[in-house]
Each structure stands twice: as C-alpha cells, then as structure tokens.
Amino acid sequence: MNLIETNKALLSFYASNPKVVLAVPVWSSPKAHEYDTSISFLYLRTNDSDYIINFNHIDAQRCNLIKFDRLISPNTLVFGNRYLDTKGLDYEWVYFEEYGKPFILNEFAEEVYRGYRSDFKYLNDCIPLMRWYEVLKRIPLVSDIKEWYRVYSDSIRTLGRLEGAGVKVDEENFIDRFHFNNEYLPKGFAYTKYNPYTVTGRPSNRHLGVNWAAMNKSDGSRANIVSRFKGGTLLQFDYESYHIRIIGKMVGYRFAEGETAHEHLAKYYGVSTEESKALSFKYLYGGLDEFAKGIPFFQKVDEYIQSVYQKFVISGRLTTPLYKREIPFQRIEGATEQKVFNYLLQALETEINYKKIEEVLKCLDGRRSKMILYTYDAFLIDVHPTEKEWVLKDLKFILERGGFPVRAYEGSNYDNLELIP
C-alpha cells in the first residue's frame, strides 16, 4: 500500500497518470450524511497496486489538492459516486447487478469498529489506517460491465444532487418526533438518502431513522418539514393516475382528454370515481377477472402481460423499456405473469422519474428554489417567494410532458398541502 500524505506527492501521483480501477472514499463520520461530513481518506486501486490519499485522518499528514477528474475515468468503479460527482461508475450499482445484493461499506467493514465508541461523530478519522486498509483491500472488483450500468450510474448521481439540497425542518419538533441527534442536523437541515439498489431500481429513502419515502400522513410528522425561505412555500406536484397512464403508454391505449384516467375507467365499471380507484388497484396488482378483460383498456393490458411473460420465460430476463436494463429470471421470486408485469411497471416508473428529476434539477439550476423530495408519484419543491409562478408554470410543463398530468398542492409545511385550483 502506498500512502500519499503531501500535496507534492499527490501532484506527482497525478502526473503519473494512474489507471484507477476502484475508488473508495472513507468519510470522517460513519453516521452523518455525506453532505454533512468530509472525506477522511481516499482508497484507490490500480491493476498492480493500491494507494491511500489522506485528507483528514490523524495517522498521517494531510493533502488538500484533490482533483477527481485526474483520478477517475469513465470506467473507474467509484463507491458513493453520487457524492463525488465524478464521471465514473457507481460501484454499489455494479455490485448489486453482479451479486444481487447491496454493498454496504459500514457492514463490510464492521470489524474495524470493534472496540471503538460508536457515538463519536468523526470516528473514521481515528481508526488506524492500516486497520482500514486490511478491510478495503478485500473489496471485490466487477469486470463485466454492462451497457446499462452507465445509464443507471448517471441516474444515481442525479439522486445525489437531489439529496444535496437538504430538507429544512422545524428543529425542536423534528428532534422530538424522530428522536433525532441534533449533531446531525446542520443549521436545521436534515438529509434524505435514496437507496436504489433494488430489483426494480425503485429507491427507498431512509436516513438516521427517518423514512422519507413513507412518512406518516396522519400523526403530524410531515408538519416538521418547512420552507427554508422567509415567505417561502412548499409546492408538491402529484401525478394523476400515474401507473394507469404509464401502462397506457406501454400497451398503446389513449385516454380521453378532459377527464382523469380513473374517471375514464369508472364509466366502464359503472361506479363512482373513488370506487374506480379501488377496482383499478385490484385489477392491476391482483390480476384480471373476466369482467375486467371485457374492458378495452384491460384487454390491451392482458395481451401485453402475456406477451411480456412469454418473452421473459424464453429469454430468461426482463428488459426495461427505457434503459434496456436486464433483470435475470432468478431475481424475481415466484415469477407469475402478474408479478413480472408489476416488476416491469415499477422499473419503468422509476426510469421515467429519473429522467424527470434530471430535467427538473436542470431547470432549477441558477434558481433559489430547490427540489427536496421525490416519492414515486410526487415531487416536492421548496419554493422561493419570488419564483412561485415560474415554478408552477415551468416545472408543471416539464412533468406533464409525455402525457402525464399533474396536480399542484401548496402549503407552509409538508402536512398542510392544499390543492391549487
């Protein structure tokens, strides 16, 4: 192992044009969000050697001239790539695709923490570098890089940008409600953390005990999320009948303009719109009965489900429509026609959302307003008071493009959002 602990040595290393195959930043805090801590040191591996570049660890002198573009190539596997914003490949995604399970560094490196106090925020700066090295050198490489790994790496990097906005909270009540350690609440901001390492790619979102993706709607938890701006507001864009409309795109079915998809299907069911929602949910996720198969929309859905399943069984994989990701047969346990279709639907929803998030973040570049949360069929924006009308117009246009209507809700906090007529 080669230790680089001076700027002179680091510049010399850059000049050698190293071909780095793996990069693993170890952050000073094992618990804090990456946007709330610093890099302790960077572990690098080439084909014939490995290196540690020190920045904040107490075992060595410190460098401060990090230039990731001089170290990371498009083919470098980078752990936590979304927080370094490099052009490399997301190591965790590549690992998940190869082994079918997530790679969690703190669990992989569990042995380095034995005998140390877990409540010290900057613990990773204190555990001996050689102890770290003995673990990091065992991180497995993946050499078979599929084409879609890069597309997903780019999308996961987009999630990192979304996390970076932070979420302004009512500190006292947030700490009380979630038993949150204020040491991890810089200037009243909490951080989301998306976990996209799932079979369908759809991310969960949990950090330090807060489940952002499934925050309770009835116990006041959401009231703790507020705007960071004086006179600011929270705007949420909700997709209308999102899954039904995605399915319509998949099967080639057009819904009439001027009515919601649920209103459209209610006419065939002969029930109210509210009852229509429940029936559609039953048919889409529980299977179609003979009555449903007599409805034009579900006739197309039934044909599509059978076609997808037949291709899945023959090829041994499920290929997503947008990113062309291949999900192996064995990753879908108990693969029935309905289950395979549901996996495909969830994967497509996720890929559409990744593209939409990228467009929204690009649109918000240079603006004060921030996108702060994504929950499958809803996007939450923290809006500066001078940008409200612009957000309502421009972001609504982006989200609805492609035939996906949204409704906008506004509130002073995440709990009191009301529909904007």
Q: Where in this protein do the model-derived segments appear?
A:
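Acidic, glycine-rich two-metal-ion catalytic cores of nucleic acid-processing enzymes
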Residues: 2-4, 8, 16, 23-50, ...
